[in-house]
C-alpha cells in the first residue's frame, strides 16, 4: 500500500492569492454591514417601542435592551433565542407531563 505524497511546489500562487482576496473581501463586507447595523441601531434607539413580556403596554427602549422592535407587534422583547415550533414539535412548556 503506497502512502500518498503531496508536492506543494506545483501550487499556483495566482489562484492562492485570488482565493485569499475573495475571503478578505467577504469578511470585510460582513464587518462593514455589522458596523452599519450598530450605527443604525444607535440612531434609532430612542424612537422605537417594545412590548414587555406578558403585558401589552408600550414602553420606551431604555438603551439596555439588545434588540428593539420598531413595529407595534405583540411579540416579546428580543432578548433570547427563538426556538421555532417545528424543531421541537412535542415540547409543551405550559403543561407538565405526568410520570
From Swiss-Prot:
One of its GO terms (biological process) is proton transmembrane transport. It comes from the Viruses. It is found in: Virion membrane. The keyword Protein biosynthesis does not apply. One of its GO terms (molecular function) is channel activity. Residues 1-18 are virion surface. Its main location: virion. Glycans are attached at residues 3, 7. Residues 41-99 are intravirion. Keywords: Glycoprotein, Hydrogen ion transport, Ion channel, Ion transport, Membrane, Signal-anchor, Transmembrane, Transmembrane helix, Transport, Viral ion channel, Virion. GO terms for cellular component: host cell membrane; membrane; virion membrane. The keyword Nucleotidyltransferase does not apply. The chain crosses the membrane at residues 19-40. Pfam families: NB. InterPro entries: InfluenzaB_glycoprotein_NB. It is a single-pass type III membrane protein. Belongs to the influenza viruses type B glycoprotein NB family. Putative viral proton channel. May play a role in virus entry. Dimer. This is Glycoprotein NB. It comes from Influenza B virus (strain B/Leningrad/179/1986). The lineage of its organism: Viruses, Riboviria, Orthornavirae, Negarnaviricota, Polyploviricotina.
Amino acid at each position: 500500500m503506497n502512502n500518498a505524497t503531496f508536492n506543494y511546489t506545483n501550487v499556483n500562487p495566482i489562484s492562492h492569492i485570488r482565493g485569499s482576496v475573495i475571503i478578505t473581501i467577504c469578511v470585510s463586507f460582513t464587518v462593514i454591514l455589522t458596523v452599519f447595523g450598530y450605527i443604525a441601531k444607535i440612531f434609532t434607539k430612542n424612537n422605537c417601542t417594545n412590548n414587555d413580556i406578558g403585558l401589552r403596554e408600550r414602553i420606551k427602549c431604555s438603551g439596555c435592551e439588545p434588540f428593539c422592535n420598531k413595529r407595534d407587534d405583540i411579540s416579546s422583547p428580543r432578548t433570547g433565542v427563538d426556538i421555532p415550533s417545528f424543531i421541537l414539535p412535542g415540547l409543551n412548556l405550559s403543561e407538565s407531563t405526568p410520570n
